[in-house]
Amino acid sequence: MEKYKIDKIFKLLSKEIPHPKTELKYINQYTFLISVVLSAQSTDVSVNKATKNIFKIAKNPKEMVDLGEKNLKKFIKTIGLYNSKAKNIILLSIELIKKYNSKIPKEFDKLISLPGVGNKTASVYQNAILKLPRIAVDTHVFRVSNRLGIVKTKTADQTQLQLEKIIPKKWRKDTHHLLILHGICYLLNTKFQTSYYKIHLKC
């Protein structure tokens, strides 16, 4: 898609969603990373419901390790893949303590080396916390960006590469949240067809 069309789409999106930001609730950088790990294949609502209680007693790596995998599972059993997520969160916390003095590394390659942290999670963290122009792509961003015609891709990785190549720099910081929130608010609404989809085709 031509860049002027992409720019027009994002101008429309930014008018509908003037303050795009994560809906995950968190206290600090560590709790944000944990929330993103938990959000894989789960809703932000279900994650926030669980972390509201978790973060009262475990808001740093040491406290999470002290909580333990078994107890953590009790808090997140309503979240998808809770067994593997609990295991990864404890392993992640141990690694942060041993390798990084309980701090979260900034480098992408170090982030994705942490248990339970993949490309999407690392990109979301760098975008939201470090304010880097990373465009994290999950199933929502993949679906919406293809449906809008911004890209024509078959995988999330392909989508991220294409979006980071073609999205104007001024929109990259907010691309992830604009597309996600647009998908949640408008994709199943007729307004999506009339206000966005049809308009950009007529550009």
Please annotate each region the language model reported.
Residues 2-203:
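Catalytic cores of DNA base-excision repair glycosylases
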